[in-house]
């Protein structure tokens, strides 16, 4: 590099970085989500950021996601050696685009070491070749849970997912939300009753999944492009627009099952949906938190049963803030055994970005510190260090100012970081084993004995 060449140190488009106040908010949300996941017995795992490409692409797992491939970048001398020898390198590898496909590979690798049903959570970054724009990222954190069984998996695990979603979003106080539930078998069975082919059904599900993005008129147009005739198209539109209370929709589906040509798939889907709804209610989730929405399809090919999407009421334009569903064949792809699973995912990076922009969430102070012990005189540093440790041992987060500056500047720096208290100890205070405690929020300053300082700070902390 030439001496005057400048390095472009800006972040690559679509790859976020966080200021301390933003990162602390993310950590708070991660901790809240983790506590709820663990309260239901989910256990943490970690999978590699890089997987073999054939794993990520198996059986159409990739969907519409653009995968980032990984190629080693060799030093110039090594590259020349490789070119000369004609080496082709190792198998193709890529960055994971979600947590679910790597979970399937993980279970295949550790099948005999795990206990089933296997309930895991993972809160990790994934990578997709999204078109970088506001609220969409190429690197983002997902907070996933999945339960995977061997041969069978109770539908009560499907019912448990809305209960978990409800606990998380009520705990973080983001306002009213609605969990929209459907079953892919209901959709598939309805399409079969219209004599739509299996290949067309997959396309129809993907098109319906975009209803809110592209609107009804474009959905009709896209369906007709797939060879769906106008009569079939209108029946599909009428079907996915069925609404009402949960019980109303279930009643309409049961009535429809009596008028449709015999469809085992449709009837099974309605039965599963009713079982899940009953379980959701038994878990104490209030009816205002969920509904049946027949337009919810989830575009990924591996979903086969229950599907979920969660939206914020009044902020529907933000899109889904938590989604997921049941899959029957994803894990079995790797081991040739039936291993049904169900899971949900919270796209946390995207969620934080959208909620901050909408003013629904606020960042936290940039430091976790609650107290600053200011530096009045360098020769009193042994006292400052001792007092700081006493405060920490009482469970407080403390910064000790090692550099002596004007007192006003030390107050300003503490206030800028959102720190509530400053402890002031000069020569006279040190000799008398006292301190001045300044509350930067209220401006109040009181004299406190050093022995009483930890409890006084905790008493006043807001």
Curated annotation (Swiss-Prot):
Residues annotated as signal peptide: none
* One MF term in the entry's GO annotations: histidine-tRNA ligase activity
E.C. designation(s): 6.1.1.21
- SUPFAM superfamilies named in the record: Class II aaRS ABD-related, Class II aaRS and biotin synthetases
Biological process terms from the Gene Ontology for this record are: histidyl-tRNA aminoacylation
Alphabetized, the UniProt keywords read:
Aminoacyl-tRNA synthetase, ATP-binding, Cytoplasm, Ligase, Nucleotide-binding, Protein biosynthesis
| Main EC class the enzyme belongs to | ligase
Q: What is its main location?
A: cytoplasm
> Which InterPro entries would you find in this protein's record?
aa-tRNA-synth_II (IPR006195), aa-tRNA-synth_II/BPL/LPL (IPR045864), Anticodon-bd (IPR004154), Anticodon-bd_dom_sf (IPR036621), His-tRNA-ligase (IPR015807), HisRS-like_core (IPR041715), HisRS/HisZ (IPR004516), HisRS_anticodon (IPR033656)
Task: Give the reaction(s) catalysed.
Answer: tRNA(His) + L-histidine + ATP = L-histidyl-tRNA(His) + AMP + diphosphate + H(+)
Q: Which GO terms describe its cellular component?
A: cytoplasm
Compartments in which it is found? Cytoplasm
Q: Which PROSITE patterns match?
A: AA_TRNA_LIGASE_II
**A Pfam family of this chain:** tRNA-synt_His
Its quaternary organisation is: Homodimer.
Regarding protein family, the annotation reads: Belongs to the class-II aminoacyl-tRNA synthetase family.
Protein name, entry field: Histidine--tRNA ligase
The gene name on file is: hisS
